[in-house]
């Protein structure tokens, strides 16, 4: 029986792994579920899969969660102390699905705990942690297996052939605004941006997909995760989301990774790694794929897609990656709370990148400081807009 910890269990990815585990409960023992504030769903999940412990990040919700679990043997913790406890448990596998920069410190704790496998559904911890985080994982002999469909696809392809690479291409669905013209995009609402045509995702990543800054973050993630030069990375719009990544070699051959667009497939891969297990999901039927479309990204309509490449051209990639991520998180939050318009998101990110000139990143504290400075500048930029 595989022992499992799930961080961010009430989010979109967290709910999917809960479904997978519930369908095969005799194979998994869930040691802890961690969530930010959704106590009702967290309590339901814990009872459903008989989790040993739960942690709620918001300490004000501790008693409510405890009351919901009266009559069970499930242990309840909250806040930072609960997070430290959760990351120190002896488990075979941890799913890191906390959204945004908030995942970085728990990721560091997990790696230091000596866990063997972390399934990473959080690109921001790699974008911001960079080589510091990955070097720590290597030192501790921790295997980080990416959950993002594109990076999971690249990971699987490169597991058989890493030599003589010419290019790695990440595909992008194009998001919910792909078919709109620029004038339409100027006036989109929050509801327009969170309705992704292909993937089931949370609000933040749905907005990132709409601005295509998500793809910029993924380019930086690939740069770090696969130790590949920026000039060997590319993006292609592929609305059907059947091909998730393409690895091209110097001999003219390319290997494409294909599956139906279902995040349960890469999640199951990480759960079974280094083996493979069957999963109840729709399988790819090539005969039903009437066409596969590929479109060059339109950087005029979606300027956010080029920011990752621009960051990778700078002399201080690590700091600028942190600045990009921090400004984006602040701007997306402002958009979701209807404080700014959709096109303001990229404007705020660009202004923050121009204004913040941070020094060398050489420690976790410098990462956190750069993040904090960038958030303040981004917030100030937003305040000046209206």
UniProtKB/Swiss-Prot annotation:
One of its GO terms (molecular function) is 1-deoxy-D-xylulose-5-phosphate reductoisomerase activity. Its cofactor is Mg(2+); Mn(2+). Pathway: Isoprenoid biosynthesis; isopentenyl diphosphate biosynthesis via DXP pathway; isopentenyl diphosphate from 1-deoxy-D-xylulose 5-phosphate: step 1/6. 1-deoxy-D-xylulose 5-phosphate binds at residues 123, 149-150, 173, 196, 209, 214-215, 218. It catalyses: 2-C-methyl-D-erythritol 4-phosphate + NADP(+) = 1-deoxy-D-xylulose 5-phosphate + NADPH + H(+). It comes from the Bacteria. One of its GO terms (biological process) is isopentenyl diphosphate biosynthetic process, methylerythritol 4-phosphate pathway involved in terpenoid biosynthetic process. Gene3D superfamilies: 1.10.1740.10, NAD(P)-binding Rossmann-like Domain. Pfam families: DXP_redisom_C, DXP_reductoisom, DXPR_C. Its EC number is 1.1.1.267. Mn(2+) binds at residues 148, 150, 218. The keyword Oxidoreductase applies. Keywords: Isoprene biosynthesis, Manganese, Metal-binding, NADP, Oxidoreductase. Belongs to the DXR family. Catalyzes the NADPH-dependent rearrangement and reduction of 1-deoxy-D-xylulose-5-phosphate (DXP) to 2-C-methyl-D-erythritol 4-phosphate (MEP). This is 1-deoxy-D-xylulose 5-phosphate reductoisomerase. It comes from Ehrlichia chaffeensis (strain ATCC CRL-10679 / Arkansas). The lineage of its organism: Bacteria, Pseudomonadati, Pseudomonadota, Alphaproteobacteria, Rickettsiales.
């Amino acid at each position: 029986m595989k022992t499992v910890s799930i961080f961010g269990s009430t989010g979109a990815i967290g709910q999917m792994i809960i479904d997978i585990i519930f369908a095969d409960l005799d194979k998994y023992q869930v040691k802890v579920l961690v969530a930010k504030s959704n106590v009702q769903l967290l309590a339901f999940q814990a009872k459903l899969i008989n989790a040993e412990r739960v942690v709620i990040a918001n300490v004000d919700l501790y008693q409510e969660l405890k009351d919901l679990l009266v009559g069970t043997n499930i242990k309840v913790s909250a806040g930072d102390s609960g997070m430290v406890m959760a990351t120190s448990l002896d488990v075979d596998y941890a799913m890191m699905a906390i959204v945004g920069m908030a995942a970085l410190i728990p990721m560091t704790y997990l790696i230091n705990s000596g866990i063997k496998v972390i399934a990473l559904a959080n690109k921001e911890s790699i974008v911001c942690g960079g080589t510091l985080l990955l070097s720590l994982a290597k030192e501790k002999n921790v295997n980080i297996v990416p959950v993002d469909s594109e990076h999971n696809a690249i990971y699987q392809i490169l597991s058989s052939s890493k030599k003589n690479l010419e290019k790695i291409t990440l595909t992008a669905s194009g998001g919910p605004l792909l078919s709109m013209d620029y004038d339409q995009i100027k006036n989109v609402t929050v509801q327009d941006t969170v309705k992704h045509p292909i993937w089931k995702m949370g609000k933040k990543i749905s907005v990132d997909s709409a601005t295509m800054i998500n793809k910029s973050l993924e380019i930086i993630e690939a740069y770090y995760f696969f130790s590949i030069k920026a000039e060997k990375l590319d993006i292609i719009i592929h609305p059907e989301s059947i091909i998730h990544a393409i690895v091209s070699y110097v001999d003219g051959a390319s290997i494409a990774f294909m599956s139906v667009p279902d995040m349960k497939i890469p999640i199951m891969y990480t759960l079974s790694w280094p083996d493979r297990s069957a999963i109840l999901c729709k399988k790819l039927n090539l005969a039903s794929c009437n066409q596969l479309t590929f479109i060059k990204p339109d950087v005029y309509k979606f300027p956010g897609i080029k920011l990752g490449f621009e960051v990778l051209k700078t002399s201080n990639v690590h700091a600028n990656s942190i600045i990009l991520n921090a400004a984006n998180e602040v701007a997306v939050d402002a958009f979701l709370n209807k404080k700014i318009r959709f096109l303001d998101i990229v404007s705020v990110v660009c202004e923050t990148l121009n204004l913040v000139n941070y020094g060398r990143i050489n420690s976790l504290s410098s990462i956190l400081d750069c993040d904090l400075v960038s958030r303040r500048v981004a917030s100030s930029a937003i305040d000046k807009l209206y």
